[in-house]
């Protein structure tokens, strides 16, 4: 299905891209009559992203230990679309070929993650270090650098060592803090001399909410009144505890990073994943007020804490005793504990205030006193949603979210760690259909334009952008049915890669203008 047209889309390639006046505060954008790399400030990085569990495979090589998702998908195959990451897209064996695919796209950077159990098979250094696993990431990082691609490394992208999960419940226990700091410090010391961009945690909201409040992702915990599939868990409690331990772990890891001599000159942050919200009913003042509350619960929960040192006051007021408290020392470590804001943006929703919460059935969504709606009070959808789309497409929300972060958090540096379009092709899935991904191409066009407007008009300090994803891969509870890649992976025929129309578009977009690697370092 061809994507429904939205305002500006028909004019996109004819539009004269706004240039910044040279004396304006904020980013300076060159004049351009076509949206491309040349429409952005010099030095702006463009790349693609993946995560270890979603692409590597090779779960029995390099003495890798079991990860949370390995066991979860074996125990509950129906909750992983009867798929798993045992082989994934075999990036472990094909990374050199895949790096050539990155070069083909003219990208500058690649976001990857390190699998904790591939480094410490049993979760802790004292129980053994996999030197083969350590060497694999050295080889991967070196190959990226050799090919002119800057590595961005995520320390934790949801692959908790199963041994720690079995021993004390993983992030449900404060014992995770010491173990995570040890692991993070190890990878900083090992790779910090050549990796200068780090992300401690990917999407802490998704990890805690989906894993411990609604049970849609591993470890699949929640109360039965939220999801009957959950066999254990306590909604409205565990998600807050997990995030609390995660944030303290982040602060400890950042302290270790800032003491790392090899790491000098680098930056560290978190990749957040909020939606943007519009009022469900513009005539209802409560819906308007609910937007700030929604953003505090989905973004401020983590970003307020790592910026100001504590949770948003509205969360303290509503959640009450169920929200753990930080010590004075923890607050001091958390405050200003990031060098940039990592942002993953996919979609937006309407925010409808919740009239009658049920205190006997607490959960994160109810605590925020809103419901998420895909249509407003007038029955209009937010953006568009093609038949195969996983999420509604609303690029205006991208720009609004960027401006919100600039205004609330004193204009921090922002890096777009993920932005992409997922689609489920179903019975029509084939190489021919999957590579003709015009909807994804239009999604990228519109979101790149919205980001360019945020940078060049709103003066938001965005410095990098990564498409999710380089390749179709294992998409958690959706398995392999939900495709996000710029390259189609043929799961029926040797995992062969095929460039999609979106990949051709991104390559053309990046072919114009000066790559950061072509600039002198003192010009950046």
Swiss-Prot record:
Position of sequence motif Prevents secretion from ER: 521-524
Domain of life from the UniProt record: Eukaryota
Regulation: Activated by tissue damage and upon binding to PBP1 or PBP2.
Field pH dependence: Optimum pH is 5.5.
Keyword DNA repair: no
Substrates-to-products reaction catalysed: Hydrolysis of terminal, non-reducing beta-D-glucosyl residues with release of beta-D-glucose
Keyword list, A-Z: Disulfide bond, Endoplasmic reticulum, Glycoprotein, Glycosidase, Hydrolase, Signal
Record function comment: Beta-D-glucosidase active on scopolin > esculin >> 4-MU-glucoside >> DIMBOA-glucoside. No activity with pNP-glucoside, oNP-glucoside and sinigrin as substrates. May possess beta-D-fucosidase activity. Required for the beneficial interaction with the endophytic fungus P.indica. May participate in the control of root colonization by P.indica by repressing defense responses and modulating other responses required for a mutualistic interaction.
Family: Belongs to the glycosyl hydrolase 1 family.
Name this protein carries in UniProt: Beta-glucosidase 23
The species this protein was found in: Arabidopsis thaliana
